[in-house]
Amino acid sequence: MNPKFKNNIGIMVPEILMPAKNVDLTKWACVACDQYTSQPDYWNKCEEIVGDAPSTLRLMLPEIYLEKPGETEKIAAIRKAMHDYIDNGILQNLGEGFVFTRRSVGGNTRNGLVVALDLECYDYSKGSTTLIRATEGTIVERIPPRLKVREGACLELPH
């Protein structure tokens, strides 16, 4: 993150990395790691669909696997995939900027903006009044294993 964009509103300009044009986006896209946490069949099907193709599935640890056998190996594989995707041009650096998003669900359109959040302005505690706060309850027990995934990671992924 470029310090010249630091401010007092908790938002910073991110460096944008996007998949290369030859990446199959139907295999690239994946739901957030905290979804389907009690449905191993969902994640097994994702693995089957993705196969060996580049995918965000390789860049995050679905929470269903937290604190389970093989977690350490999965985290090492995530870090390796991050480096491989950068080194081999699977991820293309578009520079600093924002990404405007638009999605339609059930006939309603939602617009969004991908930004970088200053985590110094974040608090997940219930009743927090910080600039950036959780929109849903945080399961505190999941924070340490999530941090293990982020330690030494060369990428931060939007959620």
How should these model regions be labeled?
Residues 1-159:
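A cross-family signal for N-terminal binding/gating loops and helix N-caps
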